[in-house]
Amino acid sequence: QGAFSSNANFYLASIAFAKKDMEEAKRLFSLVLESGDTKFREESWARKAEIEYLDKDYAAAMESFKHLQAVAENPENKEAAKLGLMRCAELTGQPQEALLAANDLLKEPKLSPEIMSEARYVRAKAYISLKQENKALADLKEISKDTRTIHGAEAKYLLAQLYYDNKDDTTAQTVLMNFIENGTPHQYWLARGFILLADIYIRQGDDFQARQYLTSLQNNYKGDDEIAAMIEDRLGKLKK
């Protein structure tokens, strides 16, 4: 009876999952897991974790990914568990957990370039959150080689910001000039780069150059975010 019902529940759960009836699928996968039948355990944890993650229930998903990691034999599920743990840790603001999960994921032998870049990005951000900025440099340098990606564009800006925070204006300036030269489709991070460049000029006492960059950005940036306020704030201070 038990084996039959877990067979049936797994089959019905898979149908519900395929039909995008996620609540029913989660209920049925949970029943399979509660039955103690090991035949469908790995796939049930994988699907349950995926449903919880898509539902933005990151705390529950994190627990399910931990269970999946413990039982996974399929290489795809092993990688999915590590990736899921890393993403959930980052999304729930747990840098230490995110760092451990990223390191674990980066040990996987056949990661795609996109996943490798994401793991390096998460690791770098975790180091920055943990006030270990210097440990983030290697990852930021690597990811920022490709500013076509959102992670690459943000990494380029963060790299310059770290140099600026360390009072190394020359290197920060070089990174930003390279960013401007190479460009990026991610205009928000390029705009943050322009503002940081203006901050460098302000610190160096070159208010004229700072104003030029800020005014140019003000006239050309079309995004609806905090960039406009950041420009106003700096231009206001330059007028004093």
Predicted regions and their residues:
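Acidic, polar-rich low-complexity tracts and alpha-helical solenoid repeat scaffolds
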Residues: Q1-K240
